[in-house]
Each structure stands twice: as C-alpha cells, then as structure tokens.
C-alpha cells in the first residue's frame, strides 16, 4: 500500500497550502465535503492529491464569505463540473441574503442607539404609547 500513497500530500501540507486548518480539513472529511484521496490503513493519516489543494482553497474562500456548508458543497460541485456560472449564481444569491441581513442588523443598531440615548424607561414608555396601552 505504501507505493500507492507515494506523491500524496499529508493533511498538514494541504492545510499549509490551502489556508484551511487541519481541524477544518478533518471536519470537511467528516461531512463529506472534501474527502481525502486515501487514508493510510496503518496510521489513519488522511492523504490528498495535489489537485485537491485548489479545491481546498476554493472551500476556504467560500467559507470566508460566510457561505453555509450546503452552498459551499453546491458551488464546489459546480466548479468541479466546470460550471462557473452556477458558482457565480450561488455567490450572487448569498450576497442578496447577506445584504438583507445587513439591513436587519442596521435596524437593530439604530434601535440600540435609540435605547442607549433615551434610556430604557423612555423607550418602554414610547412603546406603550405607540401600542395604545399607555399606563
């Protein structure tokens, strides 16, 4: 079996070349997102082909965009199939999701600023007045 493993990269080598941590690579193996090319039967070491480094870099990039794992899985599958347009569409959809989230967060920040500026009692009184249940 040792001859079959020649030329493969260790998980540490892939981690260094891709920017992913060893822990992340193990996780992506467990969730079947980025499987090693082989696992050494004696040591249990995960081993990767050199072309898997580029795939690991793509996973790292997509996760850095806060893409959920299932969307990463979809984008990686499209990329491996040579379908760059589908990868772009996944990213565009995620951007729209993030934009909506940022809008919600800006609203929350505005309400926090109002609360801090006016004080809790004043804000609660405003809420009672606007809901028609002033005491």
List the predicted regions and their residue ranges:
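N-terminal short leaders/motifs
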Residues: 14, 48, 86-93, 130
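A short beta-turn/loop motif at secondary-structure boundaries
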Residues: 40, 128-129
């Amino acid at each position: 079996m040792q001859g079959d493993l020649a030329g493969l990269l260790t998980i540490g080598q892939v981690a260094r070349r891709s920017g992913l941590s060893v822990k992340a690579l193990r996780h992506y193996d467990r969730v079947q997102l980025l499987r090693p090319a082989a696992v050494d039967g004696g040591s249990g070491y995960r081993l990767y082909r050199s072309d898997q480094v580029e795939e690991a870099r793509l996973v790292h990039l997509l996760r850095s965009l806060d893409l959920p794992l299932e969307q990463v899985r979809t984008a990686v599958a499209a990329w491996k199939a040579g379908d760059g347009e589908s990868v772009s569409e996944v990213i565009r959809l995620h951007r729209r999701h993030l934009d909506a989230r940022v809008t919600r967060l800006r609203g929350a920040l505005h309400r926090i600023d109002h609360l801090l500026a006016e004080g809790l009692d004043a804000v609660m009184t405003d809420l009672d007045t606007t809901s028609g249940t002033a005491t």
